[in-house]
Swiss-Prot record:
High-level lineage: Eukaryota, Viridiplantae, Streptophyta, Embryophyta, Tracheophyta
GO CC annotation: nucleus
Protein name per its UniProtKB record: NAC domain-containing protein 19
Subcellular location: Nucleus
Tissue specificity of this protein: Expressed in stems, flowers, cauline leaves and rosettes.
Inducing factors: Induced by drought, high salinity and abscisic acid (ABA). Slightly up-regulated by jasmonic acid. Not induced by cold treatment.
GO BP term, pick one: response to water deprivation
Pfam families in the cross-refs: NAM (PF02365)
PROSITE patterns (UniProt xref): NAC
Amino acid sequence: MGIQETDPLTQLSLPPGFRFYPTDEELMVQYLCRKAAGYDFSLQLIAEIDLYKFDPWVLPNKALFGEKEWYFFSPRDRKYPNGSRPNRVAGSGYWKATGTDKIISTEGQRVGIKKALVFYIGKAPKGTKTNWIMHEYRLIEPSRRNGSTKLDDWVLCRIYKKQSSAQKQVYDNGIANAREFSNNGTSSTTSSSSHFEDVLDSFHQEIDNRNFQFSNPNRISSLRPDLTEQKTGFHGLADTSNFDWASFAGNVEHNNSVPELGMSHVVPNLEYNCGYLKTEEEVESSHGFNNSGELAQKGYGVDSFGYSGQVGGFGFM
């Protein structure tokens, strides 16, 4: 008799209705900055893996939390021993940057960069494009160990599978039909609701029956329309002197102005100068999220870092 696998979600003991929808700023300041400074988290929602050792469709099973998108802390290796370009080879293919970088700021200070990448199967530059997307968050001036072969000790990655045009068309048609029927006024509330459910079931079934080029066992059946975000172009950032992320994270922890529900958080000012340097890759933030995290319950205590157990703008308790 084999050993029964433990569900990571069950181990977290999360309250009903828990959602994790952090903003770009929250991911950068409250998670990546603290991770780079060596702090632990009272609630582990982001797994630590070497993301570039796996194909993206394997990653959902390695995540600690998530249904439609998954978060990971991962190191980033150099492409060449003394170079500054990252190695993007992963699993059976490679990640390719696309579009424009987005600079993440807090309290008017630039703290990190968000990069969007698409996974291709095969060898560059003749790989086959898939619908798997990665948003990579990295610090502007990461802390690096002397002589390290890694470009970054930690970056934070959001992984998700983009909805195809065929899936989106089926979704839109189903919603339109359901709304049209609901607005006719010829049926009772009960029959309208029943028909709405039938329509939803039919187009979800149609989605499941379609054959896509890159199907995998972790395909998600719950689909939603693509979201868009404003893209910010920039020429680059200067290589400043090593910034003390440990001190910065310590200030964040020491600051007692941590918000309750719905209040904006306070982050100390970062006193350093940013210059400019030429970027080597073009990237696109094709799928942004601006809604904050949510918790369905209240009344939790304060953890060792001074963060309230109530739901706040940070998306964790």
